[in-house]
Amino acid sequence: MTRKDDESDQFFCSFCGKNQKEVKKLIAGPSVYICNECVSLCEEIIEDEDKESLAPAEASDKKLTPREIKDVLDTYVIEQDRAKKVLSVAVYNHYKRLDAEVKSEDDVEIQKSNILLIGPTGCGKTLLAQTLARFLDVPFALADATTLTEAGYVGEDVENIILSLVQNADYDIEKAQRGIIYIDEVDKISQRGDNPSITRDVSGEGVQQALLKIIEGTTASIPPKGGRKHPQQDFVKVETSNILFVCGGTFTGLEKVIERRISQKSMGFGAEVQSRKEKNVGELLEQLKPEDLIKFGLIPEFLGRLPVVTSLSELNEASLVKILTEPKNALLKQYQRLFEFENVKLTFTEEALAAMAKEAVTRRSGARGLRAIMEETMLDIMYELPSTENVRECIVGEEVVLKHEPPILLFEQAKKQA
């Protein structure tokens, strides 16, 4: 009901309760009034909701070029330019193919190009796939190939990968069928000739065979509530032919396979002799051929479903320092934001950043290991800081990283005295 003060003959806003003297305008309706302030507030709320609802559609409808896709990857992933170019072109062609199939019904069928990423731990393989999925606003699922087994053995069925994607799409099947799946550690399911357990291959070549169909494109039957299949259960049908599969692995020792092939071809008089130490692993991986991956242990049928192959280089100390500071969600920026909640400025010296990068190289953990090193460095600081009053800046130096010594704290009192 509209409030009206009979004695003063004043009208009140039906929403906020302010009278006509407290606002600029009071608009009358059928037995109700609304003030100009509430109208402005309603406009802001509607505008914000429209932006949120339209943003995903605009992102998915916009025709992004490979260059624009790479520009987005550049803001989150340091270096690895060739891998980012390969991914950008592959993703661009993949979704262009899906759009073309909707608009055209001619006889030309363009097959999808799944991707194989080869590189050491912590070089950015998983992050590249995650960033693509987030930016393109498509569902994303991450799977570990080492947990997969053939049907009939204890372990994860390969179709559970599709189930994870459907769950991440909130069971929107149409949306899930345009998603991205990243399968990590595919090098661990390789079948090598010298494998002592070749007679019982539970999670090696058998898993490669099981992955063939869903990667190439098939109709997978997914239990709606997860878990193992039951005969009485109603299955959800998911078409995988439009799902982009990105596989990744470290492939430790692959460079030796490549080197052996190159050495055999370069034997004889006049051949250039180069020691193994002089040969860079990254340079060897650039000379990768499908036959090398087959000798490593991937079966030809599985490799044939991954036509786009690219390698990522190992990150050196300079690259790791950039990863700490430059990306949009850089680790240092995350901790600085945490310290801002305490009204404290967090500063790392160049020596401290270099020490963290050097430790990550020593551990051979790449960018993934930087968070663990940062946590170790910051544990005592973050434990003591909330109990310490009037701190305005925390300066972390090299000794804090290497010897876990206390950081330099600057207090508000020192600022006032100065």
Swiss-Prot record:
GO terms for molecular function: ATP binding; ATP hydrolysis activity; ATP-dependent protein folding chaperone; protein dimerization activity; unfolded protein binding; zinc ion binding. Residues 1-54 form the ClpX-type ZB domain. One of its GO terms (biological process) is cell division. Keywords: ATP-binding, Chaperone, Metal-binding, Nucleotide-binding, Zinc. GO terms for cellular component: HslUV protease complex. ATP binds at residues 120-127. SUPFAM superfamilies: Glucocorticoid receptor-like (DNA-binding domain), P-loop containing nucleoside triphosphate hydrolases. NCBIfam families: clpX, PRK05342.1. Component of the ClpX-ClpP complex. Forms a hexameric ring that, in the presence of ATP, binds to fourteen ClpP subunits assembled into a disk-like structure with a central cavity, resembling the structure of eukaryotic proteasomes. ATP-dependent specificity component of the Clp protease. It directs the protease to specific substrates. Can perform chaperone functions in the absence of ClpP. This is ATP-dependent Clp protease ATP-binding subunit ClpX. It comes from Desulforapulum autotrophicum (strain ATCC 43914 / DSM 3382 / VKM B-1955 / HRM2) (Desulfobacterium autotrophicum). The gene is clpX.
